[in-house]
Each structure stands twice: as C-alpha cells, then as structure tokens.
Amino acid sequence: MPVRQLPEIIVNRIAAGEVVERPASVVKELVENAIDAGSSRIDIFSDGGGRRKIVIADDGSGMTAADLALAVDRHATSKLDDEDLLQIRTLGFRGEALPSIGAVAKLSITTRHASEPHAWTLRVEGGDKTPIAPAALSQGTRVEVADLFFATPARLKFLKTDRTEAEAIREVVRRLAMARPDIAFTLAGEERAPVTWAAALPGAPGQLIRLGDILGADFRANAIEVRAEREGVVVEGFAASPALTKANALGQYLFVNGRPVRDKLILGAVRAAYSDYLPRDRHPVVALFVTLDSREVDANVHPAKTEVRFRNAGLVRALIVHALKDGLAREGRRTAANSAGSVISTFRPASMPPANWDWRASPSYPVGGSAAPSFAERAQAAFDVGAPSADIRPTEVTPDLLDRPLGAARTQIHETYIVSQTRDGLIVVDQHAAHERIVYERLKASLEANGVQRQILLIPDIVEMDEATVERLVARGEELAKFGLVIESFGPGAVAVRETPSLLGKTDAGGLLRDLAEHMAEWDEALPLERRLMHVAATMACHGSVRAGRVLKPEEMNALLREMEATPNSGQCNHGRPTYVELTLTDIEKLFGRR
C-alpha cells in the first residue's frame, strides 16, 4: 500500500485520542481555557457523566469573530509566541483542545469580546465546521459539548458508568478550583445539588478557605502552613498533621506554576517527609504549590499536560522535603491525633453491673502486695527509674502543672497508659509510644552532633543466628556503629556485641539484632543511607523504650510528660501511631449527655 497523506478530519480524530480520553478531559481543557481568559467566575454543567452534555460558561475576555474562526483549527493559539515553547505561562498552549473536541463531538461556542458589538457563535460536528453567526451573550464565552464520541463510537466502550465519569469530572474541577481560589466555581448537573466555591482573597488565608471548602473541615482543622524558597524555587501550601491520613495517595494535590500535575518525584518527596510520622499503610493529605521560572520546568511532556519535567529535580525534591519537615516540626505536639471526636463516637451507654457484682474482685483492684518494680535504670534517661514504684493511686496535683500542655499525671491504668489532668480536660498517654519517640529523637540528635555515645560491655553478648543473617548484619556494621552498636562476626552463625548505645541502657542485644536483621532484609539496595540510618534508629528506639506493663511512679510519669513537651514530633511514635489522646471537658460532657 502506497504512503498517502491522511485527511484532516482523520488527523484530528487521532489527535483527539491523546487529548480527549474521557469527559473529564474535555472539562479540564475547557476550564483551563476559561482560566487563561482571565475569568473571575466559571460555571460547569454536565449530564450523563459528560457523555450527553457538557457546558462551560465564563466571564472572561471572550474572542473576536476572527479569533473564533481560528480557534477550532489545529495548533491555532493565542497563548504561545513563535519561539516561546520553553517559557509557557498559561495552562493551555497547544491549540489542540477545541479542534480535538470538535472532531469527536458536537461542539458549540458562543463568545463575546469587549471590542465587538455583539457575540458570535460557531458549531463543529465531527470535524465539520459551520460559518460563524451573530448570537446573544453579554460577556465571556459559553462552550457546549454534546454527544461526546458520537463520531468515534468505539471510544464509548472504554468509558465507565455515568456515576464514575461524573466523579472524574468533579475531581478535575476540584483540583483546578484549589489552584485558583481567586476564581468562583459552580459545578452542577448529574441530578445533584449545585456546588459553589466562592472566590476567596489571595494569599494563604484565602487558599486555606478554598482548600477547607473542598477537602473538608477536618483538613482545615489539621492544616499546617508550609513554605520554603531556594534558588528561585518556591514551595508553599498546606499539609495535614499526621492525625489526618488516608489509605491511599489520592489526598495529595500537587501544582506546578498553577497547573495540577501528577509527579512521582513530588509524591516521593512527600512520602519521605512524612516517613517519621506515618505507618507504611497510611498516606498524608497535602496541597502543595511549586512556583519556579517557566524555563526551569517542561510542561510539554504529554498532550494532556498532567506531567512535567524539572531541570533541577533534586532541588525541587529537597525543598519539598524541607518545607514539610520544617512545618511538621514547627507545630510540635500539635501533630498528635486530635481524635476526641472519634473517641467519643466509640463510646456506648454502659449498662449497670449486676447487683451481686463485687468491686473487690475486680482485676484492677490491688489486693495486697506491692506494685511491680519500675523499668531498669538507664544512663541518660529522662527520669529516674532506679527504685521500685509506689502503689498506683491518684497523685496530688500542683496548680502550675495543670497549666502545662500535657498537664499533671494523676494515675496509670493497665500499667500501660498515663492519665493526666489539664485545666480543661484530661489526656491519656501511651507510655511506650511516647518514650519511643523521645529515644528516637535523641538518637537522631546524637547522630547529627558528635555521634551516639557508647557503653562497652565487660562481657560481649554472643548472639546466635543463621549465617545469612550474620553476613547481613556484619555488612552493615559501619552503619550500626554510627548509633553506638559495635558488632563483629564470632565464628559461623554468631555475632559478638561489644558496645551498645548508652541511651538504651540495659537492652536485649539478641532481640535488637534480630529485629534489625529483619528490617535490613526488606531494604532495597537503592535505599539512601539516611533512610537506612533512620530505620536503624527507629528499631533501636523501640527496644530502648519503657514497655507496656511497667509500673511507673508519679514523678516518673510527670517526667515523661515534660520530656514529651520538649521533644519535637512527640505526638506520634516512630510508626505513626498517636502517643496521646486529649479529651476536653466539653468532650467529656458530651459523653454523659450534658451537651
């Protein structure tokens, strides 16, 4: 078969396959055009998941009759100069959206420019263009798209249900609305009540209002403002505290020069920044806006313009990690779970105990004997734990302690949780999780300073394990030594532990080494050294922390609370779980139906 030139209508339909994947793609392209036109209000309507009808109306600059005639031709655009491809400042620039839509649907455009005496309208059906004609419209542009993919019916087979396609449209509009809080958006149709996001003032306060309207009150309540700038690159936005997480990464909204994007580099940076705060199966909620010189980023990677390529990707990633870590650390204990609402929802009215119930027989009632001894003394511990603990009974509270953020310890329950009293409520602390974070932060600080102090064992601990595990540990010996854990091979199937971190005091060297070996087996060889060291620190902190089931004296409990107040990120343990839960008096009164 000889080589021949394809007809223009076929070329447009092929191009439409890249630009118009589904109804949401149409909405994205048309709303971006409205934003580029300087609109202050954009109304979106869809029906049948966008298959039957899509309408986008704006109050932007509109088009003249001459511009309208050219707008539906391929690669006709007002947004790009002859040699300006490396300095793209608009959301759209290819000049492909309108001709691509017109090639596969019934497209109608009505527009009015301020210089024109009246509006003009133009129709394109399956690539066939009609002459422009006068029309009635006060201002801006109104675009209607009907019977999407009627000219390419095979594409209809790949669309999802109307409900799914409508949700995809909603998500596209949400992302564009996040990027431009100064523009009012209305989304209607699909037999739903219209949703309106009013225009907000520019700057961070307006941005947070818009994000709260879209992402919900929980995000607004947990939002932490972040910002960092270096070498002309600015990262700003809001990140939710670790108290608000999702089971997937769908709550991460990323924008580059105002353009919503999906970028693995940025997603990886977000994950790295939260690595000290969240479990592996939870994901943070963030809205980050990266602004940089348009010459430093390539938006012309894909026809849909959802992917970008940075000239200095390392700088962007480092800046995102720095901005998020700085914001989370700055908030300190506020990153703890503000879970009073969820706690209250789990309570149910209690039934009265049977009449013959004997409170003396309750397992929680101490019957004779002394309390168990406290955990072993540690060389740099936050509090003295050398003597046996006293009986657990409510302690005297001094007024000044009630004013401290974590209040005054009143008692310990189930030998695991510390109950403290504040001026306006109470706090329940998980003693192991809290101390684990304290030890972890100390290990990190020591590593960044002069290294972790070691204690030499008079008699080395000999730990037996399989040869593969021994090889794995010895191979990482240099990294372990940075944390004060000095080991060496002791014949086949054994490791000698000669020094341990002073922070850990007396520790189970065998258990620690086995846990470290298990984690090392999961490491990817490409995992950066810093990440590997943090994994080691987290494992050591877990082993060096006070365990559940250890009875604490009142002064020990208060010392732990004070250490938490002075420790960064003490709201979560190293695995991302909350270290304490706070209940205000209002919350408690709700439990008893007083409010």
From Swiss-Prot:
InterPro entries: DNA_mismatch_repair_CS, DNA_mismatch_repair_MutL, DNA_mismatch_S5_2-like, HATPase_C_sf, MutL/Mlh/PMS, MutL/Mlh/Pms-like, MutL_C, MutL_C_dimsub. Keywords: DNA damage, DNA repair. The keyword DNA repair applies. GO terms for molecular function: ATP binding; ATP hydrolysis activity; ATP-dependent DNA damage sensor activity; mismatched DNA binding. One of its GO terms (biological process) is mismatch repair. PROSITE patterns: DNA_MISMATCH_REPAIR_1. Belongs to the DNA mismatch repair MutL/HexB family. This is DNA mismatch repair protein MutL.
